């Protein structure tokens, strides 16, 4: 079985049971075989100091049969490997490798590097590889080093990938970083922790997908934490291929749920800028639900930070892929703290769209976005369902809360849906600046009813219209309420409501 990613700069890697190829490298018939050094005869331990291993792969334990690889370890200090692209064989560093068994408790420790131009070129760094069975409890610790090869805490060909940890500090990775990967199983409770580092491509806590088929499994309870660090795309957990980016195989999708994954991004350095493009708590590309995932940006009490180039942020999302229908995105959360500014950094094109939950062909219910003094360059949507030709869905029970000191560059929607119900959504604006109109719920072709909008504190809506509900064709009034509490100022217009409540105006001389 194999797995291929193709990203914006055409980086491609292929993983076979016997061959790793990265960044343009390829196997050549009759080419030289890499040399393998194993710790099988020394208790599963290998260490290297102040050396570059040329066309050589390192294994704590390596078993070419069904023997499990357990508690193997490779330790490199100011050392690395460099493998020519034309060589064949397993290319990289493995704490433990089992061709037909499980891999448990294996480790790779890397501190510093030796080969300055491209350490770990045409290689993979893998805590534990399981050809059959679970990859469980493996880890990579990568400190003050560089790698042009991908990092996997654990890889399972046909089993669960769980409880693996990748820790990166003060390093540069010009490839991808994955806590746990499986081609057919559950990626559960894996973790990636990155501090003071730069990752050029993708970071994933836990994932399941494979080329050529719709892999069946799940990504649950995985975690990613970035501190003072940059990446291109970040997923807490994912089922299926790369969201919105060609994989090179239209069926590189998944069938299963992405549930309970968490992504935290923060900076402890005041005035710093973190480059990120796409942020996902948990997503499904294929068929399945993305529920109860969470994204937290910023840290209370930390210095101000700009998260630059961000164009997409989902708490949880499910979209179609490979001819199979997506699923629901329910109960996801996004929290943006007061020290965070999100922008795309492209001049007049600035804008970041935020979705608490997004479902291409399913329900987007009970999602929540909270902006506590943060700054967002474009629109905010609590829950969104496209539905379209796939029939009706729901975008119900979603919540958006904006507190004082926040600024939103675009419109605010509690719930948004192409076809179906956008009802029982709740928007609370407690001060701040809103750059567009406010909709409790919006349905292209359906009802937007029983939504509530509450405005309090100091907020200028003189050029904004508040809609209890909006729709091209549907009921947009019944049960919709707008309330003003302890506030003052003006509103351009209020439309499509049943009940208007005004109490305790903060400034009666500037009453609504």
Q: Across the structure, where does each feature detected by a protein language model lie?
A:
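Sec-dependent signal peptide cleavage junction
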Residues: 24-34
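Surface-exposed loop/turn motifs in large extracellular/passenger domains
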Residues: 33-92, 97-124, 129-150, 156-176, ...
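Bacterial Sec-dependent N-terminal signal peptides
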Residues: 1-22
């Amino acid at each position: 079985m194999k797995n291929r990613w193709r990203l914006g700069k055409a980086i491609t890697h292929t993983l076979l049971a016997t061959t790793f190829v990265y960044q343009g490298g390829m196997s050549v018939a009759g080419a030289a075989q890499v040399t393998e050094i194993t710790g099988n005869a020394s208790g599963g331990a290998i260490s290297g100091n102040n050396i570059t291993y040329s066309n050589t792969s390192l294994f704590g334990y390596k078993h070419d049969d069904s023997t499990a690889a357990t508690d193997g370890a490779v330790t490199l200090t100011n050392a690395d490997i460099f493998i020519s692209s034309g060589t064949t064989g397993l290319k990289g560093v493995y704490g433990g490798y089992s061709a037909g068994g499980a891999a448990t408790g294996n480790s790779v420790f890397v501190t510093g590097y030796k080969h300055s131009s491209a350490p770990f070129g045409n290689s993979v760094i893998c805590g534990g590889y399981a050809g059959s069975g679970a990859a469980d409890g493996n880890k990579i610790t990568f400190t003050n080093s560089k790698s042009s090869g991908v990092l996997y805490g654990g890889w399972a060909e046909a089993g669960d990938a769980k409880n693996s940890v990748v820790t990166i500090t003060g390093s540069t990775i010009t490839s991808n970083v994955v806590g746990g990967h499986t081609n057919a199983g559950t990626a559960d409770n894996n973790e990636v922790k990155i501090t003071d580092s730069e990752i050029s491509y993708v970071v994933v806590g836990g994932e399941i997908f494979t080329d050529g088929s719709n892999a069946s499994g799940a990504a649950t309870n995985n975690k990613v934490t970035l501190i003072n660090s940059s990446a291109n795309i970040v997923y807490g957990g994912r089922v299926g291929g790369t969201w919105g980016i060609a994989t090179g195989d239209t069926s590189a999708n998944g069938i299963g749920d992405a549930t309970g994954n968490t992504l935290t991004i923060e900076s402890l350095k005041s005035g710093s800028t973190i480059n990120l493009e796409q942020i996902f708590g948990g997503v499904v590309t294929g068929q399945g639900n993305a529920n109860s995932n969470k994204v937290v940006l910023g840290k209370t009490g930390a210095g101000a930070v700009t998260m630059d180039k961000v164009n997409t942020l989902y708490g949880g999302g499910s979209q179609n892929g490979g001819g199979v229908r997506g699923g629901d995105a329910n109960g996801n959360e996004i929290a943006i703290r007061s020290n965070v500014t999100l922008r795309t950094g492209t001049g007049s094109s600035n804008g970041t769209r935020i979705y608490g939950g997004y479902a291409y062909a399913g329900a987007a219910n009970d999602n929540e976005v909270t902006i506590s003094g943060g700054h967002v360059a474009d629109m905010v949507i609590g829950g969104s369902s496209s539905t379209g030709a796939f029939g009706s869905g729901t975008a119900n029970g979603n919540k958006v809360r904006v507190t004082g000191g926040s600024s939103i560059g675009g419109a605010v929607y509690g719930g948004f849906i192409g076809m179906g119900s956008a009802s029982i959504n709740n928007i609370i604006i407690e001060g701040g600046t809103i750059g567009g109109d406010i909709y409790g719920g919006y349905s292209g072709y359906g009802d937007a009813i029983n939504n509530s909008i509450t405005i309090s504190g100091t907020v200028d809506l003189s050029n904004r219209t508040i809609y209890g509900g909006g729709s091209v064709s549907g009921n947009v009034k019944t049960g919709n309420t707008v309330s003003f509490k302890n506030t003052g100022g003006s509103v351009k217009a209020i439309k499509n409501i049943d009940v208007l409540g005004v109490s305790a105006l903060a400034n009666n001389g500037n009453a609504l």
